Amino acid sequence: MKKLLFTLLLAAFILPFAAAQGKLEVGKKAPEWALPDASKQEFTMNSWPGKVLQINYVDPDNEDLNDTFNDAVEKAIDIDKIIDQNAYKGFGIVDLQSTRLPDGLVRAIAGRKAKRYNTTILFDSKGVLHESWGLPKDSYSVVIVDKNRIVRGIYYGKIADADIPGIIEMIVKLTKE
């Protein structure tokens, strides 16, 4: 009986720690991944060395949820010129496990977004980032990582308009480090 109780207590302490391994946490290094684009070319975070990354992990059913935020970032790059394009890369990862939309339609939506924001779109067909980063399904998550791949911000769902200037300010500071 004591052995069973000890085993259960040990499992209660170890399992949460093991489950947390690899999950995103602000201030910690982001676990690496490899995902393909539409032409099946593999990308990792190291595909953009020395750049601050804004990673949009998107359920195609919510693809427009953070357009206001992305438009503000685009303005900060192209018009205000406060984000150095040589030190920053924003891109999308389509969460194919969170939708029932046909693959062709999802790829068309992704192609439209890639053109609109002049960016790369990757595809997560196996839910890699659900597992390794703990990102929720059926949502839109934005992750900011610095040049050393340390997580500096995690935003779930719609980013509030009031939070946008602060996030852009953080990106500006990170690109200058």
Model-identified regions with their sequence ranges:
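Short active-site neighborhood of thiol/selenol oxidoreductases, capturing the structured segment around
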Residues: 44-69
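Sec-dependent N-terminal signal peptides
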Residues: 4-16
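Short, internal strand/loop/helix patches
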Residues: 89-93, 103-138
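Thiol-/selenol-based redox modules, centered on thioredoxin-like
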Residues: 138-177
